[in-house]
Amino acid sequence: MRGKFIRRKTPLIVFEGIDGAGSTTQTDLLFKYLKSKNHRVIKTCEPTDGPIGKLIRRALKHELKFSWQTLQLMYSADRADHLDKLILPAVNAGKIVISDRYFFSTLAYGELNLDGKWLRELCKNFPMPSVTFLIDTPVSVAMERMESSRGSKELYERKNFLDKVRKNYLKQAKEFSFYVLDGTKTKSEIAKEVLEILKKKKFI
């Protein structure tokens, strides 16, 4: 599966990883750094805070129940709205966009319960990000982080499930040329690697 890349002066930067890997932390750190350097930048995430994204978040917290297929259709609808209303207008306006998760999450998580070909068909028209960072974190480390920061587990937060998700992400890393970062390093060490890569690619 190969969607069109976003080719603009400013990039779409994506962070991926299993729950507890640190993608949200790295999104926040990069956003703060770029703001401090007076870059025009926005940060966002999936699921979004839009109407569909809010329903997905309720499902993840076990407040609503949908079939796996329905949930992935909702993710795709949320993403399409996300691209149309925020990501593409921002990139076209010359702003750097940093997203905590993108369609790679659909493939990594969704393929455990649904047909991979069907999921890829859902995702095939979504544009490729300019660069994707996979924070590869052992499940035991991620689970420990989540247990210390959250009171209850979300829908996908089970060890055997996350082990498989991690393997799916590593397969995607080869297919989509992710930059794979060691999630056991400190957050500052990872952030430094991210900046080095972005500067080398002349995105910042």
Predicted regions: what is each one?
Residues 15:
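Hydrophobic anchor at the beta1->P-loop junction of P-loop NTPases
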